[in-house]
Amino acid sequence: MPQKTSQNSLRNVALTASKAYRTKEGITVPEWDGAKVTLREPSGDAWVKFREIVNPQLAEGEEAPTLTEAEKFLRNKAADVVLFIDVLLDENGERVFSDEDQEQVSKIYGPVHSRLLAQALNLGMSQEEAGKP
């Protein structure tokens, strides 16, 4: 039977930043000399930035430009980097990168980063968990 939480205790837990997201701790990254990282699901702010990159706002009557495959790849990579720098945490639960690191991370972003991002995205709530059809 779950332990009953006092109202004050519940409030404190609900206001704890480290408990605002699902996390996956102790992930070993062999390609990074066996470094251990923590991943969390992306924040709402990161999702907004992601969507702004993938679907930039157009002026009224303006059509979205047709992108080449290379342009689509670069756009999608830039959007993924925004999420990646948001979800990668060190063993203490602190972000490894700041938003200012986006350009630097984008230059080296590869399959290892992409696999870690995929794990973080899987922490998000499924439609079944949200009770949606």
Where are the predicted features?
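Extended acidic low-complexity intrinsically disordered regions
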Residues: 1-24
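Short acidic-hydrophobic surface loop/beta-edge motif
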Residues: 23-33
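Short, surface-exposed, charged amphipathic helix/loop patches that serve as local interaction elements
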Residues: 2-5, 32-133
